[in-house]
Amino acid sequence: MKQYDVIVIGGGPSGLMAAIAAGEQGAGVLLIDKGNKLGRKLAISGGGRCNVTNRLPVEEIIKHIPGNGRFLYSAFSEFNNEDIIKFFENLGIQLKEEDHGRMFPVTDKAQSVVDALLNRLKQLRVTIRTNEKIKSVLYEDGQAAGIVTNNGEMIHSQAVIIAVGGKSVPHTGSTGDGYEWAEAAGHTITELFPTEVPVTSGEPFIKQKTLQGLSLRDVAVSVLNKKGKPIITHKMDMLFTHFGLSGPAILRCSQFVVKELKKQPQVPIRIDLYPDINEETLFQKMYKELKEAPKKTIKNVLKPWMQERYLLFLLEKNGISPNVSFSELPKDPFRQFVRDCKQFTVLANGTLSLDKAFVTGGGVSVKEIDPKKMASKKMEGLYFCGEILDIHGYTGGYNITSALVTGRLAGLNAGQYARS
């Protein structure tokens, strides 16, 4: 029967980080994963370039982790985003900063990040087993004691770190295996839901694919409550699809759509094409341009204002022919057209499923986890890190920051615990 100090289950970002941290404490570590290679989620992150962290101040990073980000304050006081940058630079990975604080390897290759982590594991003599499914985690006398593999092999250890991810992006291996093991240790799993996920709509223009493939730049997208008040607004790009809406602004708003759908059957999403101009000013500016070119068609005058497909769509919606000139322009429908430029509303009736989401909302309740150690409050020697925890952030280096920070602390503390 094999015996290790620490067993890490899951070879994603947080599991790799945990195995390295435990190994650096001098612990004998086994890293076990059911897939055929480690770091699969890392390798596809950031469009294959790997957005390893974000350089914004800690306060801002917490704001970009709307799902229990505040739980990470203690963790960040031990190991934060600047420490992540130093960690990678010490492994020989030079990073560069891009828009919104996003940090990428200078090589633009996610694989270089994965390789650097694997080399570090090798240096620390961490035992790696891939293609190995786990049946259960062993608990004896209120203590984590090892694992049982699918073929019945028992492997003992002083500490176990569960780093198996959530239920999103399942082709990388995160299929929700860990929730059962957490429950067996007495943990509560909060309700799971998709976040960072495209939104669906049954609007006729969506079904008819009128705007399919059309992308709007730097628009303000708001999710409205029952009273028509915005719950959240994100100013970014968005995209119309054959099933609804997608793109960065929509992905960020999606978790609020999921929550609001519990209160109303359809959730209004408002699109403001010109967030920096108020409606009256916009009306006056457009009206003035039309007035100054009285013979030109409305389509030709307003073409520079927005993409032609969107312009024609909003004109038709308000019963205005694209070929009318200023003298024939009906004023009331034109006012309504301007209002639609500022507050066109699409009714969302759902989102794509959890396996199509980028991030899982919900997970092991953070109330039952020591925030400085990532240790279970229910079971001695048990640790959690990464997306299995009830923590979720926006895309842009925030989830990976949470995964790497919680992984570092879980590994560090599990290593020290096992050695003591």
Curated annotation (Swiss-Prot):
UniProt-recorded name of the protein: Uncharacterized protein YtfP
Residues the entry annotates as binding FAD: 14, 33, 134, 387, 399-400
Species: Bacillus subtilis (strain 168)
Record's keyword annotation contains Coiled coil: no
Keyword tags: FAD, Flavoprotein
Pfam families linked to this entry: HI0933_like (PF03486), HI0933_like_1st (PF22780)
Cofactor: FAD
Family: Belongs to the BaiN/RdsA family.
UniProt-listed InterPro entries: BaiN-like, BaiN-like_dom, BaiN-like_dom_sf, FAD/NAD-bd_sf
Superkingdom of the organism of origin: Bacteria
